[in-house]
Amino acid sequence: KNREALLSHGDINGRKIVLDITEKTLQHLDAYERIKSIAHMEGDTLCIGSRRWDLSKKRNVYLLGAGKACNHMAMAVDEILGDHLTRGIAIVKIKEDTDVFRKTDVYVGGHPLPNEEGLRACKEIIKLVDSANEDDLFIVVISGGSSALMSCPIEGITLQDEIDTTDVMLKSGAGIYEINAIRRHISAMNGGMLA
C-alpha cells in the first residue's frame, strides 16, 4: 500500500528485501490464499492435497466454519466449490466488507464472550448436521477463536450462564486451556460434541 513511500528514502535495497520478505510471509499467512493453494476442483472432483472426493456421488456438500480467520477460509471454499456447494454456515468475529459468499450464511458470533447470533448459528449447524446422512459431505474450516464463537450451551444452561461463566474466567486470568476445559462441559458444540 505504501511501498513507494517506504522505498523513497534510506537504504532502498535493504528496504526492498525486507518488504519482499514481509509480503511473501503475509501471503503465506493469508487463510484465503492458503486454502486456494491446497484445494481445487477437477471437474466434479474436489482435490485437497493428495485427497480426492467425487462430489457427483454426494447428495449434498456442506461447508461449516468458525473462527477469527473463518471469513477468508470459508470464502475460499465457497468459491472453489461453486455450484457443488449446497449450503454453508460460517461463524466469524467480524464480517468484512470484502466478504463475498455465494451459498454461505455468515453469522457474527461473540468473542471473547458468546452472543445471541453465535447461538443462532450453532442451532442452524446442529439442524444441518442432524438432517445429514452418509451420502452428504461436510467441509469444516476452523481457526483460532472458534470455541468462543461457537456458543451453544447444553440443556439446562442458558446463554447468559455461558456468558457469565466465560466473563468470570477471563477476569480471573484463566488461560485458554482452562477456559476450553470448562466450555467442553457446558457446550453442545465444543470438545467434540458436534461430531
Question: Residue ranges of each PLM-predicted region?
Answer:
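N-terminal loops that bind phosphate or other acidic moieties
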Residues: 1-195
